[in-house]
Amino acid sequence: MKLRGLYAITDSQLLDDGRLLPYVEAALRGGARLLQYRDKSSDQARRLREAESLRELCERHGAQLIVNDDAELAARLGVGLHLGQTDGSLSAARALLGRQAIIGATCHAQLELAEQAVAEGASYVAFGRFFNSSTKPGAPAASVELLDQARPRLHLPITAIGGISLDTAPGLIARGVDLVAVIHALFAAASAAEVERRARAFSALFEPA
C-alpha cells in the first residue's frame, strides 16, 4: 500500500477506560492509513490482547498496524514496527520481520539519522517534533527547512510528528510530508464520533485539490 495520509498513534492514558477500540475504529473509519500501537507498559499479556484486537480492526478497514518498540510482538502478529533511536537495531528488526514488513524510524531533527535509517532498511522516516508536543515535550525541535532538505534526498515516505493539528498539517503536507502522525489532536476527544470527524478532516488534507 502507498504510505500517505493520516497516521494515528495511540496513547494509553488518552484511550483508557474502554476507549481504545471504539476510538481507534472511529479513526480508521475516518480514513487513517496507519495505526501505531504505542504502549510502554510491562503488561505483556494485555498488550498482546490489545494488539491482536487492533490488528483485526486495521484489517477490516484496510489500514496497517504498526507496533511501537517491540519487534517480537510485531513478528508474532505479522505487523509493522516503529523504532526510536534507542529502541534497538533497525537492520536486526528488518532481518526478523522480513522484506515486506513496514518498519519506521524516529529521526528527530537530523537528516543524517534519516539517511542511516534508509541504509538499514527503513520503510519510512519520521521527523519531529515540529510543534509543542504533550507526548514528548522535551524532544528536539524540527523545522520546515529540514523537510526542504530531506525531500530531494530521501526517496521514501516522510512522516511528521509532534503537536500537529488541523491548522498546522497543511503547511507540512505542502512541504512534501507523506504522513502526519497525530495523537492528541485526534484522540483527545469527548466521543468516538468526534474522533471520526477529526480523522476525516485530516484525511481530506491529502486529497487532490
From Swiss-Prot:
GO terms for biological process: thiamine biosynthetic process; thiamine diphosphate biosynthetic process. One of its GO terms (cellular component) is cytoplasm. Keywords: Magnesium, Metal-binding, Thiamine biosynthesis, Transferase. 4-amino-2-methyl-5-(diphosphooxymethyl)pyrimidine binds at residues 36-40, 68, 106, 136. Pathway: Cofactor biosynthesis; thiamine diphosphate biosynthesis; thiamine phosphate from 4-amino-2-methyl-5-diphosphomethylpyrimidine and 4-methyl-5-(2-phosphoethyl)-thiazole: step 1/1. Condenses 4-methyl-5-(beta-hydroxyethyl)thiazole monophosphate (THZ-P) and 2-methyl-4-amino-5-hydroxymethyl pyrimidine pyrophosphate (HMP-PP) to form thiamine monophosphate (TMP). This is Thiamine-phosphate synthase. It comes from Pseudomonas aeruginosa (strain ATCC 15692 / DSM 22644 / CIP 104116 / JCM 14847 / LMG 12228 / 1C / PRS 101 / PAO1).
